[in-house]
């Protein structure tokens, strides 16, 4: 069972308004945790390692580092695929600095199941999910960007490789952007296949473009939901921190 006790991580709950609007949801027989963020109001960040190069891996070390700057996590989840040493597999941009380059070739595994894509937030807070080859051709200036794959929804269409009755069901998380610019983080709390997860993003969450992030190491930190999931170390972490003052 996933541990969801903030106290176990030494993370207190401050009396303040959450930056993310997070709710548990149910769609047919499947349960989800969904958080909606206005990227023009809240700063979505990517985190990987501290100043010494040590990968955070979990929410507690990241929160300890944020505390030194007067901040605390409000929302976070694993932010993309990574190598065994937890380096990002594809494009990774944090604070406007590219750490890893974009990968546009077809390859093994979910990441290489084209089309894959990039979640990008630019310097004025506009967020987009962009197909990887279109991203490479456009080369937008992103304040943060993370590449993953496959795309779940591409311009309103499900990824063509998804099979409705597939028995490959896992806990999964992903990110999408609505037509009004709001960013939607979603985590499946019951195992789902790609087709079901993508359909949920398109039809229920109303995101015409959405990106799969991970399907094995899937965890959520949500102050509003009282969750700080524990488990194996992660690579990139995506989310929102807020000031504790």
Predicted regions and their residues:
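Residues that act as N-cap/strand-start positions at coil-to-secondary-structure junctions
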Residues: 29, 113, 146, 169-171, ...
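Zymogen propeptides
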Residues: 17-110
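Active-site-adjacent helix-turn-beta-strand microarchitecture at beta-sheet edges
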Residues: 87-162
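Conserved, well-ordered active-site substructure
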Residues: 89-105, 161, 165-173, 177-209, ...
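Bacterial N-terminal signal peptides
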Residues: 4-14
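Short, solvent-exposed aromatic-acidic interface loops
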Residues: 49-52, 133-137, 187-191
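Structural motif
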Residues: 73-75, 117-118, 126-128, 150-151, ...
